A protein has these predicted regions:
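Charged helix-capping and loop-helix junction motifs
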Residues: 8-11, 106
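Conserved catalytic motifs of the protein kinase core domain
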Residues: 2, 19, 118
Length: 154
């Protein structure tokens, strides 16, 4: 669900049992591909729309960005860390100036988190990114292929 739809109808959708997700869709919308920025924008825009500083629920937005997104993509086995579930996770460095002081970890992540805080990502138990480096991935080849596709569809 895009941030505008989530902002406009979030409560109604939740009451109807519709799972909400947070995502990015590339250069056509904002070019950042930054989930932290998306969560922040949803919360801030919700507050502005409702003219109420308490309108946004950081817990609900974080849940939509994690478990909600997994469910919406048809991956209920990736919605939490538990035996028998996929080991998909992100390790965040909390010992950075933008994450201090820690009063409420969820609010810190949603309002202050940044992609530069990511130290590790794991997908299905395999570490794909660690300390600023993609492992076992030729990023230059990926960039080249992406540009080829863009050039072809332009």
């Amino acid at each position: 669900v895009g941030s505008e739809m989530c902002i406009r109808d979030r409560e109604k959708m939740l009451q109807m049992g519709i799972p909400l997700a947070v995502g990015t869709d590339g250069p056509s919308s904002n070019n950042a591909l930054d989930m932290f920025r998306e969560m922040y924008l949803i919360c801030v825009l919700q507050k502005l729309r409702e003219k109420n500083a308490a309108a946004a629920d950081a817990n609900a937005i974080l849940k939509a960005a994690t478990a909600g997104s997994a469910r919406c993509m048809g991956l209920p086995e990736a919605d939490c860390i538990a035996p028998g579930k996929l080991a998909d996770l992100t390790v965040i460095d909390l010992h950075r100036p933008n994450m201090q002081p820690i009063n409420n970890i969820t609010k810190n992540l949603v309002y202050s988190g940044a992609k530069t805080n990511v130290r590790l990502t794991m997908v299905d138990g395999r570490i794909l990114y660690e300390n600023g480096r993609f492992l076992n991935t030729d990023t230059d080849e990926i960039y080249k292929n992406a540009q080829t596709v863009i050039d072809r569809i332009r």
